Curated annotation (Swiss-Prot):
It is a single-pass membrane protein. It comes from the Bacteria. The keyword Protein biosynthesis does not apply. Residues 45-81 are annotated as: Disordered. Residues 59-75 have a biased composition (Basic and acidic residues). InterPro entries: TatA/B/E, TatA/E. The Tat system comprises two distinct complexes: a TatABC complex, containing multiple copies of TatA, TatB and TatC subunits, and a separate TatA complex, containing only TatA subunits. Substrates initially bind to the TatABC complex, which probably triggers association of the separate TatA complex to form the active translocon. Part of the twin-arginine translocation (Tat) system that transports large folded proteins containing a characteristic twin-arginine motif in their signal peptide across membranes. TatA could form the protein-conducting channel of the Tat system. This is Sec-independent protein translocase protein TatA. It is found in: Cell inner membrane. PANTHER family: SEC-INDEPENDENT PROTEIN TRANSLOCASE PROTEIN TATA. Keywords: Cell inner membrane, Cell membrane, Membrane, Protein transport, Translocation, Transmembrane, Transmembrane helix, Transport.
Length: 81
């Protein structure tokens, strides 16, 4: 079961012409071509997006410890004794 031979391709073409008509075939081929072109463009855009995301990763922000937060809060509010 490999590629169809020339005679088999002619039979397939004849069936397609009978099913869709000679006028519809160019429209179908054009639609298929546009679909393939759009698919390839979206795949390229997806690859570009992943490259941009990986290149633009930022360094993680520093997480303050509870002691640092407490010392900042205590310096902001005056203590009353």
């Amino acid at each position: 079961m490999g590629m169809p031979s020339g005679q088999e391709l002619l039979i397939i073409l004849a069936i397609v012409v009978l099913l869709f008509g000679a006028k519809k075939i160019p429209e179908l081929a054009k639609g298929i071509g546009k679909g393939i072109k759009n698919f390839k463009a979206e795949m390229k855009n997806e690859d570009d997006d992943t490259e941009v995301k990986s290149a633009s990763t930022e360094a993680p922000k520093k997480v303050e410890s509870a002691e640092e937060v407490a010392s900042k809060e205590s310096s902001k509010t005056p203590t009353q004794a």
